[in-house]
Amino acid sequence: MRIKSIITALALPIALAACGTGTEGELPKGEALANVAAPAGKQWTEVVSKTEEGYRMGNPEAKLQFVEYGAITCPGCAQFSVQSTEELNGLVNNGNVSFEFRPFMVHGIQDMPGFLLAQCNGPETFFPLIEALFADQQNWLGKISTITPAEQQQMQGKGPAEMSKFLAGKF
């Protein structure tokens, strides 16, 4: 027992000593990346393409590729969207950062309708629709949770257009 106490007492000072003073090295230095021009007449936030796993906004050749695995019904994802969209769009518009959103089904069928609706009009409207769904999540999420197991079964195998009609009739 005494050895455990000694080891425990020495652990903190040893850990702190291992941290050092922070003067041993310097952060790497480099020049800021030059902005990359968007295609004529557009901003990079207007350049959206479908990827294998989601949708990418911005320069597909950007030095930094930011990927979010998000769920339409996730409150944390909604908070991230509401709080970061403006700043993220600013980073994307410089051409050095791209943002890809990949759907992640945290809550199963409840996540499907929003993703399907956001894809209906093609890549150009995907991000504005996702942002709108996140911004209004608390209002529509209560309605989605009223879908019965029988209705969930009916939605199985429906395409985006059929799913949209079904949901429009429900709400």
Residue ranges: model-predicted function:
Residues 79-170:
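Structural alpha/beta surface segment adjacent to cysteine/selenocysteine redox centers
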Residues 2-111:
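Extracytoplasmic thiol/disulfide redox context detector
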Residues 25-28, 39, 44-51, 150-171:
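Long hydrophobic alpha-helices with heptad-repeat/coiled-coil character
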